UniProtKB/Swiss-Prot annotation:
One of the primary rRNA binding proteins, it binds directly to 16S rRNA where it helps nucleate assembly of the platform of the 30S subunit by binding and bridging several RNA helices of the 16S rRNA. Part of the 30S ribosomal subunit. Forms a bridge to the 50S subunit in the 70S ribosome, contacting the 23S rRNA. Belongs to the universal ribosomal protein uS15 family. It comes from Phocaeicola vulgatus (strain ATCC 8482 / DSM 1447 / JCM 5826 / CCUG 4940 / NBRC 14291 / NCTC 11154) (Bacteroides vulgatus). HAMAP family: Ribosomal_uS15_B. One of its GO terms (cellular component) is cytosolic small ribosomal subunit. This is Small ribosomal subunit protein uS15. InterPro entries: Ribosomal_uS15 (IPR000589), Ribosomal_uS15_bac-type (IPR005290), uS15_NS1_RNA-bd_sf (IPR009068). The keyword Endoplasmic reticulum does not apply. One of its GO terms (molecular function) is rRNA binding. The gene is rpsO. One of its GO terms (biological process) is translation. SUPFAM superfamilies: S15/NS1 RNA-binding domain.
């Protein structure tokens, strides 16, 4: 599987406030970004997989909502996570 418990733990350790921090906006945004990149690669090979395309659109929307929340709450944390993940904004 592309996202096992060890990979999730690695993401949470890198972007969360602690190694058990799964709820912070940064940790969730990083997890969504990993899943989005995986689904994007899947869709390059399977162009007619519409259920995956819908799931990808949903994930992008969730990540966008979290980014907007973080931007409104703490602009410095927002800029840091965008830079760390290499997002366009």
């Amino acid at each position: 599987m592309y996202l096992d418990a060890a990979k999730k733990q690695e993401i949470f350790e890198k972007y969360g406030k602690s190694n058990t921090d799964t709820g912070s906006a940064e940790a969730q945004i990083a997890l969504f970004s990993y899943r989005i990149s995986h689904l994007t690669e899947h869709l390059k090979l399977n162009r007619k997989d519409y259920s995956t395309e819908r799931a990808l659109t949903t994930l992008v929307g969730k990540r966008r909502a979290l980014l907007n929340y973080l931007k409104n709450r703490d602009i410095e944390r927002y800029r840091a996570i965008v830079k760390a993940l290499g997002l366009r904004k």
